[in-house]
Design a protein with these regions (language model features):
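Carbohydrate-associated surface elements
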Residues: 71
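Conserved A3 ("GATE") glycine/threonine-rich loop of ANL adenylate-forming enzymes
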Residues: 51, 61, 74-76, 104-105, ...
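N-terminal glycine/serine-rich phosphate-binding loop of ATP-dependent small-molecule kinases
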Residues: 1-64, 76, 92
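Metal-dependent DNA phosphodiester-chemistry modules and their immediately adjacent helices/loops
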Residues: 82-88
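Active-site catalytic microenvironments for nucleophilic, acid-base chemistry
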Residues: 28, 32, 80, 113, ...
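Helix N-cap/coil-helix junction residues
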Residues: 35, 86, 174-175
Length: 180
């Protein structure tokens, strides 16, 4: 799938392209392996852990392109968090430095800049995930919205000490826990 560069320092992917490539790859792998689909009991997903997608729970449509790990559009958000002296809080809870590389400030950017996200939050229809979460949700016919600790730990919203989403950090970023 293609990389999209809408502005200097911005890197995006089209989530629908990711989905189509994933389905095509699964079909090709099954065909080449010559095994019966009924014999498949599990699959593995490897992904760019910091790449961020938000989508509508009811329609499955992304509210914006996937914001890729290399994207630097949230530099100002990160600088603001540092000015608020939150570096130690984030580091102690997540093990990460405040940086646009991670998902948290990308989520905040979408919430602040994509008007549809606000409407969906009010209706409890907005969902967030890294690529694995988005693919799992779609592969399971919209029934499973989850990730694992290795992916969650790269979002800058996951407390590595308690092994769960950190509500204090979410509050500092104005990210509702309902989207997780």
């Amino acid at each position: 799938f293609r990389q999209i560069f809408p502005n200097l320092g911005w890197v995006e992917h089209n989530p629908e392209e990711i989905w189509k490539v994933t389905l095509r790859t699964i079909k090709e792998a099954i065909k080449k392996s010559k095994i019966l689909k009924a014999k498949i009991i599990s699959i593995g997903i490897t992904n760019q852990r910091e790449t961020t997608i938000l989508w509508d729970k009811n329609t499955g449509k992304p509210v914006y392109n996937a914001i890729v790990w290399q994207d630097r559009r949230t530099n100002k958000i990160c600088e603001n968090l540092k000015k608020r002296k939150l570096e130690n809080l984030f580091r102690n809870k997540t093990g990460l430095f405040i940086d646009p590389y991670f998902s948290a400030t990308k989520v905040k950017w979408v919430l602040d800049n994509v008007s549809l996200s606000k409407k969906l939050i009010k209706n409890k229809r907005l969902m967030f995930g890294t690529i694995d979460t988005f693919l799992i949700w779609r592969l399971t016919d919209k029934t499973n919205h989850f990730t694992d600790a290795t992916n969650a730990s790269r979002t800058m919203m996951f407390n590595i000490n308690s092994n769960q989403w950190d509500y204090e950090i979410l509050k500092k970023l104005n990210i509702p826990k309902s989207i997780l």
